[in-house]
Amino acid sequence: MRYLFLAAMAASLLLLLARQNTASAIDGKAIVESECASCHNITGPAPTTVDGVIRRKAPDLFYAGSKFKRDWLVAWLQNPTIIRRAGTMLLNHIVVEDGKDRINPDTIKPCAAKLSQEAAQAVADHLMTLKDDTMKAGVVDPAMKFSQSKARLLITKQLPCSGCHQLQFGKRIIGGVSGPILTEAGQRLNPDWIYSRIENPQYWDPKTWMPKIGMSHEKRELLTLLISSMN
């Protein structure tokens, strides 16, 4: 029995090493440049004109390593889902019906690049090298205890976050669709990037409509902890 167990462990290890070697043999940078760059900005800077924002096809990726978590990237690249329910630029997806504006869901599609596990790992590895070196690290400890009630009051009543972002509290989902959904932001986003984005949205995207709101470090930290807890 012991030898069977050791043999099984050895086989599992060999399989893992084989997968790692396969992933390392795949050129993630080449895939990003050939498959992603046609829609995503992978070199920067972000658009500085309204026209540039309107022409943006997909979110910028030139700071993906600062923004995302690698495990989420690997999973998402294998099965892309819609994160922005009104599209990257909602004005490009508005239709008028009965005198009212609405979002046309038929024009909003998930990313077409559905990669194998090995390719997803290679692409994620490359994306994680695309970082903003000026972003502070370790600003927020995601394991820190915080008041859920205070955080919910802040994000839903004192600040306009739910006007653009979908939020989830238990089984209840609230909020708008013009911004990226935050219902699983804890899996997707680096807490330090969340904090930095709240602190100065225009640093990351000069023409974003997300407002820069002055607040204390404690409130910004509270928002970051709440958003990071959304899984």
Model regions and ranges:
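Sequence/structural segment immediately N-terminal to covalent heme-attachment motifs in c-type
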Residues: 24-45, 136-168
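Bacterial N-terminal signal peptides
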Residues: 7-16
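Gly/Gly-Pro-rich "capping" loops immediately C-terminal to redox-active cysteine motifs
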Residues: 29, 43-76, 90-102, 166-196, ...
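C-terminal capping alpha-helices of c-type cytochrome domains
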Residues: 98-138, 211-231
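An amphipathic alpha-helix signature
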Residues: 70-78, 82, 120-124, 191-199, ...
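Positively charged n-region of N-terminal signal peptides that target proteins for export
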Residues: 1-4
